[in-house]
Amino acid sequence: MPDKNLMVSLCDELSTAARIIGAVNTVVNEDGRLIGHNTDGIGYMQSVKDAGYDIIGKKMTLLGAGGAATAILVQAALDGLKEISVFVRPTSRFYDRLVHTVDELTEITDCRIRICDFSDSNLLKKELADSAILTNGTSVGMAPHEDTCPVPENLTFPKDLIVSDIIYNPRETKLLTMAKN
């Protein structure tokens, strides 16, 4: 398993995203200088665009604050989303890092970022009402726990909401099945 955090100290320079995230997964040698990048968020944002969706200037609701979710949060803010509501458990080991990341993004972008309690299903419903996209950045629903879902099973999604999941196994999670129905 690569050590994305250790790579930060081995680089001469970091991209803005890599610096904020604190992790590097791609190193480019530019005339002997090692430039560290984090492409996780870039890849996610490109996949949304490739699927035909333009979410720049709009609102995202993001579930989770782990490594992948943080990369998505950072890139979405850097790319120009207007607003992001991040749902995380206050007891999460990632919570303090999330607060720091949000503070840093608030200083360098115009994106409004709100940290929300993951267990507040009423607030989730309210935030989704004016969101363009819901992104599951957690592992909830990943094999071998395919029967789990990060949102309440009785949640009704707004008609035009894009629902995405970073989970790759199973290919269609319970969350995505709920969104299709």
Task: Label each residue range with its predicted role.
Residues 111-181:
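Rossmann-like adenosine-cofactor binding region
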Residues 30, 53-59, 157-159:
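Short helix-loop-beta connector
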Residues 43-48, 54-55, 67, 72-74, ...:
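Active-site glycine-rich loop that binds ribose-phosphate moieties when present
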Residues 36-38, 57-81:
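Glycine-rich adenosine-cofactor-binding loop
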Residues 79-109:
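NAD(P)-binding Rossmann-fold cofactor-contacting core
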Residues 1-51:
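Phosphate/diphosphate ligand-binding glycine-rich loop within oxidoreductases
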Residues 7, 92-98, 171-174:
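Short, charged/polar "capping" segments at the starts of alpha-helices
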